[in-house]
C-alpha cells in the first residue's frame, strides 16, 4: 500500500481510499478542494495503479496496513477516513477494530451483505474474463460502469493493465464475502453513509444496515446517481457533504 500525501501535516488529516479498479487519482477533484485546509492522504490499495505489483490479499489485510500507517506516521488518530466501494469496506473494517482511530468516517457505497456463491465462482469467472481487461474496448465499458470521467480513462486503462489475475480474484472474493463486524458499534466516529439512488438493491440495503447499526450515523441517498458517481463525478458536492458532517449540519 502506497500512501500519497498532499497539504501540510499541521492541518487535520483526512484519508481517502479509492474503489476497486481505481487508484489515488480518482480523488484528485476532492483532494484539490480540501488541500488548503487539510492534510490529505490518498492510499493506493495493493494490486492497484502504482502498487499493481503488490498482490491484493483481502480487505482485512488492507485494514491492517492502514491502521499501522496511522499508528506509526500519524500518532494513532486522524480527523477523518473516507472510502468508496472496497475502500469503504476497508474503512468499516478499520472502525470495527479501532474505535477511537478517527473523529469522522465517510462510507460511500460499501457492500456489507455477503453475496452468495462468490467464493465458488470467482476464480472460474476471472479465468474467462481476465484477458478482456487488457482490451481497450472492454475497459471503456468497465469505465462507464464505474462512472470514471472521460478525462481519466487513459489513466484508468493503464492501471487496469497492471492488475494481476490473482489480485483480481482476491479483490472480487473479499468484496463479495465481506460482512459487517459486530464490534463496529463501538466506534466513536461520527459516520456519514452515502449511497446512490440508482445503485443495486443490495447496495442500498447495505447502506440501510450500516445506518441502523451505527447509532447517530447519517444516511444520504444521492438522488439519481449510480455506484461511485458522487465522489467521482461530483467532487464539490461530495466535499460539501463532508463539510456538513464536520460542522454538524447533516
Predicted regions, residues:
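Conserved HGGG/HGGXW glycine-rich cap/lid loop of the alpha/beta-hydrolase fold
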Residues: 5-52
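Gly/Ala-rich beta-loop-alpha elbow adjacent to hydrolase catalytic centers
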Residues: 83-87, 91
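Conserved alpha/beta-hydrolase "acid-adjacent" motif
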Residues: 200-206
